[in-house]
């Protein structure tokens, strides 16, 4: 895991956990291909510590996102990136619930 420092010397991280409900009729495997591409590109972003997308049971048609970012600004920038916009335009999912927390060490 990459380490990131705050000006004060401690580590600051922004955690996000989200449950996405699949609203598209597309096959789950096709949808997950899109999310794996998103995962690969997002993990290259400056400010992204880790980003993972995992499907729940196929019958549930839900995807979990686990994300750790340097700060909230990095998250905002993430939503301006082409790979993020491309997935959003497809209207594959909607947010069922989302939890955010900031941790400073």
Swiss-Prot record:
Membrane-spanning ranges: none
Residue ranges constituting the ABM domain according to the UniProt record: 14-104
Gene3D superfamilies for this protein: 3.30.70.100
Name this protein carries in UniProt: Uncharacterized protein YjcS
One Gene Ontology MF term: catalytic activity
Pfam families: ABM (PF03992)
Name of the coding gene: yjcS
Position of the signal peptide: none
């Amino acid at each position: 895991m990459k380490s990131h420092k705050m000006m004060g010397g401690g580590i600051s991280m922004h955690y996000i956990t989200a449950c996405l409900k699949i609203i598209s009729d597309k096959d789950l495997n096709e949808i997950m291909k899109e999310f794996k591409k998103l995962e690969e590109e997002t993990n290259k972003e400056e400010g992204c510590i880790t980003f993972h997308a995992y499907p729940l049971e196929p019958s549930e048609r839900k995807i979990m996102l686990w994300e750790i970012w340097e700060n909230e600004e990095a998250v905002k920038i993430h939503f301006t990136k082409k790979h993020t916009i491309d997935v959003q335009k497809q209207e594959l999912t909607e947010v069922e619930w989302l939890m955010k927390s900031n941790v400073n060490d």
